[in-house]
Amino acid sequence: VEGQGDLTTTEGTGSYTPRATAASTGLPMSLRETPQSVTVVTRQRIDDENMRSLADVMASTPGISVQNYDSERYSFNSRGFAISNYMYDGIPTSFDMGYAGGESSQDPIIYDRVEVVRGATGLLTGAGNPSASVNLVRKHATSREFTADMSVSAGSWDTYRATVDLSSPLNASGSVRGRIVSAYQDNHSFLDNYENRKKVFYGVVDADLTSRTTLSVGFNYQDNQPKGSSWGGFPLWYADGGRTDWKRSLNTGADWTSWASTTQGAFASLEHRFDNDWRIQTTASYSKNEMDGKLLYLYGLPDRNTGP
């Protein structure tokens, strides 16, 4: 059961396009009516394409260029500019991809959708550049019945993953509802000597104070523990000016290198819905990213015959 008039929610629709989006103007409109170039990566598409990080989502978004600096860091660009405007549930936040605090590694299992508006977005994000804005919209406890979704999967490079998504009413009427989402993943990589373990947890409580007023409180946490992390890329040229030809699996990360990171956040929002699809919302949000790096950096022009 979805909240009244919430046409922007994508979970449960089974669709690759939203019924409406408020990403550009703050008003729920169809993509055709929206006066900017908008892509909404829905919950169905995230599941079908097995996206497991924000980098995966951005790589599948039209008009977005994704470049990885090394094993942990990615940059996202649009229309020739680096993307600097990021939001959680429409609330601007600060990302710094250069320090690898877990931003691009965020697991999309906790999100209903990811909205990308290409071009200038000063109306909703304030000062920035004309690249794009990225809005990560969290899941909510909308079901008035107990629901459970669990999965276990295995894939290439010794990738193992387990997920749990539980929703339940917390009182007889279902006016207070809770939801817990969790994931654990252990994987190696096409890169030599690299592996990563991550843990994800998200919990939210939604309470209908009246038929038109809803209070939401939630918390999210993700811990990334990679080993064999690399720092930076490889030279394009040998010392004699010739082009290098490295193996795709080559990794400068040593047994002791790592680039651990944690992402945590909390939020509380109060929304009141009026007639004719008008609503007012107040939100408090907190987020914190931390990293702990033990890294090895190599640079220079290697000799073709003798090596670095």
Regions found by a protein language model. Name each.
Residues 33-41, 61, 71-73, 81-83, ...:
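Extracytoplasmic
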Residues 34, 57-77, 92, 127-130, ...:
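Short, glycine-/polar-rich solvent-exposed loops and beta-turns at beta-strand/coil boundaries
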Residues 69, 104, 155-159, 194-198, ...:
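Transmembrane beta-barrel outer-membrane domains
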Residues 66, 75, 91-118, 136-141:
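Short acidic/polar hinge/loop motifs at secondary-structure boundaries
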Residues 94-95, 110-112, 123-203, 209-215, ...:
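Outer-membrane beta-barrel translocator/receptor signature
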Residues 38, 46, 58, 114-119, ...:
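Non-catalytic regulatory/gating segments with a bias toward low-complexity or hydrophobic composition
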Residues 185-189, 202-273, 277-279, 283-308:
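Acidic/polar loop-and-plug regions of large Gram-negative outer-membrane beta-barrel proteins
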Residues 1-47:
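Short, acidic, small-residue-rich periplasmic hinge/interaction motif at the N-terminus
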